[in-house]
């Protein structure tokens, strides 16, 4: 249903509020560069610091600006199942093509708790759902066996797996037998995942190198292994630098240098440390992004 380069959009801020103007411009930027789909209000979009109404504003703005030209996947993760259902229903009413739901953070549910969380949500909304497993940020790891159980639910159609472990991809593909699409959630290993059965990548790097990420995915889907890996090698220094501090700190700094956004973050996120500025600027210049 969704494939290729799916950007995990940043949320532009101005004076500690959502910068709707620049958010709309980002949608146009990605459509022009060939990005295949947009994720609004996910981790890279600072969803953890957005209020309920701000999340809805971001989702609604992206949907309205995209005008059905590319799919919009709404980040609707909430720790409480009932709150997640409510937000997902609202995103569906706005016209989101799918919901993107991270595992609950901090509370560390059991595998059975994760199954019940997602199955209750899926039964309550008539919209495709993409699971999101990112244990490095949530302290909660959804195991392949749980993914396989959830894959039997008709509107749970995909998972963003951010461990970057090739064995994890292989386990999910084997256990689910094609009943769920897998998306790379780790830019550093995305090419290898794409060439090993992943349907696409939900990417931080695509915020700045949108055209190259889309091309890399296109080459992978065309089984051009050499071409895909060549672009991945070209992008590797950028991938690495975009994670020298917590996401989205480096990517927002890079986008500010590119003139795409103002670069403001919401506390407790702070601006990129000065010691990383020169290296990131050099990589952006090498890729002809600035």
Curated annotation (Swiss-Prot):
CDD domains: DHDPS. SUPFAM superfamilies: Aldolase (SSF51569). Pyruvate binds at residues 44, 202. The record marks 43, 106 as: Part of a proton relay during catalysis. One of its GO terms (cellular component) is cytosol. Keywords: Amino-acid biosynthesis, Cytoplasm, Diaminopimelate biosynthesis, Lyase, Lysine biosynthesis, Schiff base. It comes from the Bacteria. It is found in: Cytoplasm. GO terms for biological process: diaminopimelate biosynthetic process; lysine biosynthetic process via diaminopimelate. Pathway: Amino-acid biosynthesis; L-lysine biosynthesis via DAP pathway; (S)-tetrahydrodipicolinate from L-aspartate: step 3/4. It is an enzyme of class 4 (lyase). One of its GO terms (molecular function) is 4-hydroxy-tetrahydrodipicolinate synthase activity. The active site is at 132 (proton donor/acceptor), 160 (schiff-base intermediate with substrate). It holds the Pfam family DHDPS. SMART domains: DHDPS. Its EC number is 4.3.3.7. Its main location: cytoplasm. It catalyses: L-aspartate 4-semialdehyde + pyruvate = (2S,4S)-4-hydroxy-2,3,4,5-tetrahydrodipicolinate + H2O + H(+). Belongs to the DapA family. Catalyzes the condensation of (S)-aspartate-beta-semialdehyde [(S)-ASA] and pyruvate to 4-hydroxy-tetrahydrodipicolinate (HTPA). NCBIfam families: dapA. Homotetramer; dimer of dimers. This is 4-hydroxy-tetrahydrodipicolinate synthase.
